[in-house]
């Protein structure tokens, strides 16, 4: 599962806000809402944020293994181990 905790820290460290992302950089409020809810965003949006914040992807997101009993991606069964 991807978590966005570092996104908020990086945004604050760079002196940006959701207001500036929406109004200065034309990031949609829907994208901000998806991040806030922990939902997926495109790699193109991650690239946009890396350019805005002058950072690397790992400064925005972290992969966390799902706990036992938590639903996995429907694609996980198709990935060879």
Can you annotate each of these PLM segments?
Residues 1-20:
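A short, Lys/Arg-rich alpha-helix, primarily the initiator
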Residues 8, 19, 33, 47, ...:
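Residues within the helices of the helix-turn-helix
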Residues 9, 62-81:
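Short, charged recognition helix plus adjacent turn
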Residues 12, 23, 51:
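Alpha-helical residues within the helix-turn-helix
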Residues 15-33:
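Short alpha-helical DNA-recognition segment
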Residues 39-51:
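Short, basic-rich loop-to-helix N-cap that marks the start of a DNA-contacting helix
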């Amino acid at each position: 599962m991807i978590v966005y905790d570092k996104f908020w820290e990086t945004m604050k460290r760079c002196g940006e806000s959701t207001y500036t992302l929406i109004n200065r950089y034309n990031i949609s409020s829907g994208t901000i809402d998806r991040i806030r809810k922990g939902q997926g965003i495109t790699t193109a949006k991650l690239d946009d944020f890396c350019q805005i914040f002058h950072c690397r992807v790992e400064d925005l997101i972290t992969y966390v293994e799902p706990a036992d009993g938590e639903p996995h991606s429907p694609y996980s069964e198709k990935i060879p181990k």
